[in-house]
């Protein structure tokens, strides 16, 4: 199997020269080798049934870029050469799928060639139940990286919201599973709207344009990818929706710079780590919120909503969590460690906090500046709830929080 035509590889996006290179600079990276699936109720069924039975352009496997063994072959197509009568996937040399010829039952039974007689799309290949995490023998992939690669990767993912809630072990697992994917040219199509998705991508450098066709998939012709709606730059990511919801790709992504770098995370690792960690995090916070006296009067579904809105933040000993006089933008629950409140012109701490205590509420209730500073006495972990979530979710306990204003002298918020 040629390394240049299979995932994973050192540079899977190598350009493949063909006779019609001069007509379109846009190439396509095909993530899937499975056949297209057409339902008998689809409007195109009748026309497909009455048409020729020869393989369509959209079903070609590799063109002339080599073997497709291993299930992750790469296909560079030119989708917009309408003058050559090509469909949305381009016309290349047709290569039969691995394992022998395609089934012939379709022709015998009157079904179109691309009806579901091949394998199902792999986007539905596994069912992941968060409650069964750890009950099977799944082992996350580990791709060795140099220190230089790790440094670049950490910088690329440091501000990505999808990784913000992971603990240190989960974060390391994700870093190990990511694979570097250099993009050597402009106008390379990384994913296509309507396709099944196998990877989630993080942008290390370069920019990628996002196109959406109202039809829901790439169409034939020079404008088949639709309208440009946005651009994704360094630190951004794309491809998560198709993996999270087992849905087709929602947009087409095309490289906008002559040289770019992506990091790719496969579907199973994405779902095992990111989605399961979100489920475990919710269960952990629901259990924690049950221990918070302030929230004991809430119903379970109300605590579940709060759990989904919380962000975990760690502070080392001696660091300031909130500062007196600053505008209030969040409410805090102390998850672990100890903290103390201080006021200007008052010697020593005015209040101490331990697991389950809360602070920062008064500035949000009354739209006033912070009345005190809260400093971490030890290494602490807090659950932060932003202003909007506070107003929306903590209405039922507002009276309790206001009573706390008078029961604690002076107030630490």
UniProtKB/Swiss-Prot annotation:
Dimerization and phosphorylation as annotated region, ranges: 24-161
Biased composition, class Polar residues, residue ranges: 121-138
Gene Ontology molecular function: cAMP binding; cAMP-dependent protein kinase inhibitor activity; protein kinase A catalytic subunit binding
Binding site for 3',5'-cyclic AMP 1: 162-291
CDD domains attached to this UniProt entry: CAP_ED
Ranges of biased composition (kind: Low complexity): 58-67
Pfam families, alphabetized: cNMP_binding
PROSITE patterns (UniProt xref): CNMP_BINDING_1, CNMP_BINDING_2, CNMP_BINDING_3
Location of the region described as Disordered in the Swiss-Prot/TrEMBL record: 1-145
Keyword list, A-Z: cAMP, cAMP-binding, Nucleotide-binding, Phosphoprotein, Repeat
Source superkingdom: Eukaryota
One GO-annotated biological process of the protein: adenylate cyclase-activating G protein-coupled receptor signaling pathway
Residues annotated as binding 3',5'-cyclic AMP 2: 294-413
Phosphoserine sites (modified residues): 122
Family statement: Belongs to the cAMP-dependent kinase regulatory chain family.
The protein, known as: cAMP-dependent protein kinase regulatory subunit
Gene (UniProt): pkaR
